[in-house]
């Protein structure tokens, strides 16, 4: 990611953030019905390099899709390509929480197999939620809320009426651990 970031953004470097994809052993499709699930983080994930650019514009390069876009944080529509709508949606949801998001340059990639049910989208959302919380929010937003930012991004900008399991596993997941999650109360262990 770093070499692509340097190539696209005039040799500068930024901060690197990453979040994992997930597996789920029990309870697939029960999270959006407030049921119990048994997910865990996996080694595969999304990694992004991000650097504020002192503007209101996001300049984003998807390494895997070989695609680049620029969009304004003040644009009510956002980009049309789905992989960039995730980034746009996280920005907008963080701004709704009062995080003073500013423009940034980013390059991102992942090794979560697309379409394999391992939540590459949640890993992308979580990566950017962690990054924006760090860069612009002083890390004041708690992990529960960051997971909900990802879920709201799916609902409001992608059109997917998902539950919370994918984002929760990406935000709270730990290596070599599974978690029992009650999707109604968000209690887990």
Regions found by a protein language model. Give the residues of each.
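Short Gly/Ser/Thr- and Asp/Glu-enriched loop/turn motifs at secondary-structure junctions
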Residues: 18-20
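Short, surface-exposed beta-strand-loop junctions and turns on beta-sheet-rich folds
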Residues: 32, 66-68, 187-188
């Amino acid at each position: 990611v770093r070499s692509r970031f340097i190539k696209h953004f005039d040799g500068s470097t930024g901060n690197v953030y990453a979040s994992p994809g997930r597996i789920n052993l029990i309870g697939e499709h029960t999270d959006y019905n407030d049921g119990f699930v048994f997910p865990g983080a996996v080694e595969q994930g999304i990694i992004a390099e991000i650097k504020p650019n002192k503007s209101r514009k996001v300049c984003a390069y998807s390494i895997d899709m070989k695609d680049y876009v620029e969009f304004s944080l003040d644009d009510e529509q956002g980009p049309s390509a789905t992989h960039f709508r995730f980034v746009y949606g996280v920005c907008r949801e963080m701004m709704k929480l009062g995080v003073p998001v500013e423009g940034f340059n980013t390059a991102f990639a992942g090794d979560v197999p697309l379409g394999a049910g391992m939540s590459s989208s949640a890993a992308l959302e979580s990566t950017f939620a962690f990054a924006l919380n760090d860069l612009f929010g002083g890390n004041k937003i708690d992990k529960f809320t960051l997971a909900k930012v990802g879920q709201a991004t799916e609902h409001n900008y992608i059109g997917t009426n998902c539950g919370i399991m994918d984002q929760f596993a990406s935000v709270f997941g730990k290596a070599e651990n599974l978690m029992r999650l009650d999707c109604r109360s968000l209690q887990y262990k």
